[in-house]
A protein has these predicted regions:
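An acidic, low-aromatic, low-complexity terminal/linker signal
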Residues: 1-154
């Protein structure tokens, strides 16, 4: 498996390369007033507005630092509205996005019902990065928030 590694706080995580649409540098985002702390803003991407979620905030409770290695990882995520089908884009802000790694062995981690996005660990890589399942990353509260963005681009 090929995976893109990043950091959230002190832990190392990865997203399967097949889930990554594009990796972008950190750019100025359109702020969203009164949004939850994990929502960094909206990004213009391929003629659409897509939400940007701070993975450090979501996974660790901190704030993603502004470093040269901070990137926006654009992934596909399912529509949040039951009336819509297909996929949409979502940008995940992460730090330390510098390594594309190949791993041959994965092992399950702890199953945490509140964190369905946490996947298996890459056991043949230093620091045992844990896979993030992009389609499960948004908690229900954020999924509901983005329904309106989905509907506005129909």
């Amino acid at each position: 498996m090929l995976a893109l590694c990043f950091r959230a706080g002190l832990a190392r995580y990865a997203i399967a390369a097949r889930e990554v649409v594009e990796v972008l540098p950190r750019v100025v985002l359109r702020p969203v007033v009164h949004a939850p702390a994990a929502v960094q803003g909206l990004l213009g991407f391929r003629g659409m507005l897509i939400p940007v979620v701070d993975l450090v905030n979501l996974l660790d409770g901190g704030v993603c630092p502004a470093r040269l290695s901070t990137r926006l990882i654009v992934v596909q995520a399912p529509f949040f509205s039951p009336a819509r089908t297909g996929v949409r884009y979502l940008a995940l802000m992460a730090e330390g996005v510098t390594d594309l790694i190949k791993s041959e062995q994965t092992r399950p981690g702890l199953k945490i019902s509140a964190a369905r996005y946490l996947g298996e660990h890459l056991v043949d890589i230093d620091e045992l990065p844990q896979l993030i399942v992009a389609s499960e990353i948004l908690p229900e509260s954020l999924s509901e928030l983005f329904c309106e963005v989905d509907e506005g681009q129909a």
